[in-house]
Amino acid sequence: LWGPKVMIINGRAGSGGDLMPYLFRAKGVGPLVGTNTWGRLVGTWDTPPLIDGGSFVAPRGGFYDVNGEWAVEATGVAPDIEVRNNPAEVLAGADPQLEAAVAEALRLLETEGIELMAEPEAPVRYRRPGGGR
């Protein structure tokens, strides 16, 4: 829980995978590393069943931000640090996005450090008969 946080994102993330990095950035938790998210953050509702027993869903709701502006849908969330994973490198065992995210977390750790909160006094969860602890 302590120390810098970095989130890896890419185009394989949509829906909640779009919303989470959006909120991560909005709350100032830390930088986003990778590539743009997919950009599909809509609400869907089921429709009545089809005569053959099949079904489908249709998008009916969008996402707008605290300023009342439509956000994320069709644009996704862009990274703060763009790093692409080359398939040949990944097949060879490398993970450039992970490596960049770890490097950024270590850089933030060195430049910003960690400020630990004081531990609160332990709660009293029981009382002995006669009022003793």
Model-derived regions: residue spans:
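C-terminal "post-core" interaction segments
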Residues: 1-133
